[in-house]
Amino acid sequence: LILDDIIEMKKIRVEKRKKEIPMKELEKQALFRVENEVEASFRNPFIKVLRKDGLSVIGEFKKASPSKGIIVEDFNIKEILNYYTYIGIDVFSILTEEDFFLGCDDYLKEIRKISHTPILRKDFIIDFYQIYESKVLGANGILLIASVLGERLGEFYKEAKRFNLEPLVEIHNKAELDLALKYDCEIIGVNNRDLKNFNVSLDITKELIRCIPKDKIIIAESGIMSIEDLNVIKEYGVDGVLIGELFMRKINDSEFKAKYKEFRNNK
């Protein structure tokens, strides 16, 4: 299973990083960030942006994936930033998983330096260490995957909130949704891709949205490959969408950009 391989590699990488910067030291750095935010009365913009009227769009910085291989050969993050700014993306999702998605922390650090747009750190979080790391890197939100964390979801959710990070909790079926609701998770990402076999169906959002309380923020993830798909998923009543591959493949397509902007204007 691809997911198992990703998690195994992640465990090795996290242990290696703990030797470079000890956990207590990193936690201290993260708390220092939080204290500065409190002093500056900084409000995390993540939820506010996702709760705004109309459909919120999270655009992903995505070089590769296990199912599609390399998506963007010439991966220039400043070029992608300009493109996303031009088409009006609300939140940036930055992949930092190195082995299977070819992401890296530096992408997030660099974007944070030059943009005020809220950032979701997209990775496979299995250790509190990565929560502290996300804070130090400058993320506003982090991905927590219900199928990866299981019952540990509650403690990871709480720890993220302690560091003023908004967790986007990813689910794929009713059992995972029940887990997210048990821990009163506010932002629920419905992944239309099964992480075990990587099959995709937009019907997953259609089915699960009926079971999600109206006060939650619902984000549809994966499988949105056209403007038509966007219109379909919007009709299901989601609050937002997370799109990676479609945007990455259309970076130089002016016809797509015009169509997308038209879609946004009709939201």
Indicate where each model-derived feature is located.
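C-terminal helical cap(s) of enzyme catalytic domains, especially alpha/beta-barrels
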Residues: E207-C211, K234, M248-K267
